């Protein structure tokens, strides 16, 4: 299940809407905050952000990247809050992304409470999270990028989730938790696995669809490492690999899923490169355009409002 067709289709869609927005003086602009100074996380996040920024610029938007990793830990939350409040007030900034995970000493809940819901392109503010508890619209709502991207990818390849047994490995706020809620809203039977889950292999082996969102490859982590291999899944399973980290010493990527062995068993499999990553980037573009319309509505003509 390549993410390339979805990514290319979304870029064309975004280009059209950038032109419409520019007609009323609004250029989509994404502001990105990097807060995590852990070497593995920082290198991985820089890679992700560079790709996201390239997408935005290619469709005609603009990007500002703020690295606060050199701010002392005791001041980093406060500096991030000041920055978020300034970005909230700026009309030229139409979308804000706090790159996750943030370090444990940063007050993540407070950051997302202060972030403008209208500019929240990862849909992680309390107000935007509420949509997951209702019937969401995958095409029109601001939804978490990776979970929504995964659902769009499954939809594109005709993979039905209704009534299927789905195992989500990882309960993170960015992917695992919101994805599980969204899958349940679509009438899937969902099991969520985490570090304390007993007999993980049983849940994985019985699943029709396995979504691995851990990001703790054995090459980089001694505590609770994870890799999904072909012997762990049943014949014909659909497998979606999300987690991946970069070794800062070598620049090499390591992923949740052993692609070669899983491919021998799976009916559908996302490639480690060019799979969920591209679907996530596609969804970020959609969310940025939606957020840009939120900013434009205060001054936009009725004709523009009908365009989206």
From Swiss-Prot:
Q: What is this protein called?
A: Bifunctional protein FolD
Organism of origin: Pyrobaculum calidifontis (strain DSM 21063 / JCM 11548 / VA1)
Gene, per the UniProt record: folD
What keywords sit in the KW lines? Amino-acid biosynthesis, Histidine biosynthesis, Hydrolase, Methionine biosynthesis, Multifunctional enzyme, NADP, One-carbon metabolism, Oxidoreductase, Purine biosynthesis
Q: Which residues bind NADP(+)?
A: 170-172
Q: Endoplasmic reticulum among the record's keywords?
A: no
What reaction does this enzyme carry out catalytically? Answer: (6R)-5,10-methylene-5,6,7,8-tetrahydrofolate + NADP(+) = (6R)-5,10-methenyltetrahydrofolate + NADPH; (6R)-5,10-methenyltetrahydrofolate + H2O = (6R)-10-formyltetrahydrofolate + H(+)
> What is the disulfide pattern of this chain?
none
Quote the function comment for this protein: Catalyzes the oxidation of 5,10-methylenetetrahydrofolate to 5,10-methenyltetrahydrofolate and then the hydrolysis of 5,10-methenyltetrahydrofolate to 10-formyltetrahydrofolate.
* GO terms, biological process: L-histidine biosynthetic process; methionine biosynthetic process; purine nucleotide biosynthetic process; tetrahydrofolate interconversion
